């Protein structure tokens, strides 16, 4: 009797499959479809964690969250939701995901030639500032803190970095079709 957990199928089996048949049943289709995904997954996993000179190591659940998010990204998933309780290190998890994306040069073109552009969106300025400070291991010119007041002054959104930090309200700082703020 055999069960395919991915296809949710069950059926009688007359003979045991050979190791090669098992491999093909398990990974064959996925290998041909997700070869690119496998290459990106390998790049992500080869990029070491930023450990702050050995003073920080991810907890097991943080490592699982980072790994699962990067696997989903490598497979081309556009929406990924991580839900964790207060005090579990969501900012540290986000930092490590961004660290690996940045250093593997992952981007939407998936060409590995250009640094990614990443938006860290928070609901309060204090959280955006906290995240901006937590990302201090990155080169200074990679980080940009976007404030609504700066957009109003300059009339445009800064584009001179790779990792941008702001709050939701920043997107409401422009003018409507009538020119009203």
Language-model regions: role of each:
Residues 141-147:
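Acidic/polar loop patches that form or flank catalytic/metal-binding clefts of enzymes
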Residues 122:
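Short beta-strand/turn micro-motifs composed of small residues
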Residues 1-117, 126, 130-141, 159-163, ...:
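ATP-dependent helicase/translocase motor core
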Residues 173-175:
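Short, solvent-exposed loop/turn elements at domain surfaces
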Residues 149-164:
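Conserved motor-coupling elements within RecA-like helicase/translocase cores
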């Amino acid at each position: 009797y055999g069960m395919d957990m991915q296809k949710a199928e069950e059926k009688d089996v007359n003979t045991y499959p050979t190791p090669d048949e098992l491999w093909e049943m398990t990974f064959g289709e996925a290998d041909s479809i997700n070869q690119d995904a496998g290459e990106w997954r390998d790049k992500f996993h080869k990029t070491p964690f930023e450990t702050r000179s050995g003073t920080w190591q991810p907890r097991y659940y943080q490592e699982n969250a980072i790994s699962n998010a990067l696997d989903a990204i490598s497979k081309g998933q556009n929406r990924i939701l991580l839900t964790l309780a207060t005090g579990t290190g969501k900012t540290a998890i986000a930092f490590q995901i961004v660290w690996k994306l940045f250093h593997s040069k992952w981007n939407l073109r998936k060409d590995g030639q250009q640094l990614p552009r990443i938006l860290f969106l928070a609901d309060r300025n204090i959280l955006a500032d906290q995240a901006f400070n937590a990302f201090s291991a990155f080169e200074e010119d990679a980080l940009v803190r976007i404030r609504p007041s700066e957009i109003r002054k300059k009339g445009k959104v800064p584009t001179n970095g790779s990792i941008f930090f702001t709050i939701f309200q920043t997107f409401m700082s422009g003018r409507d079709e009538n020119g009203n703020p």
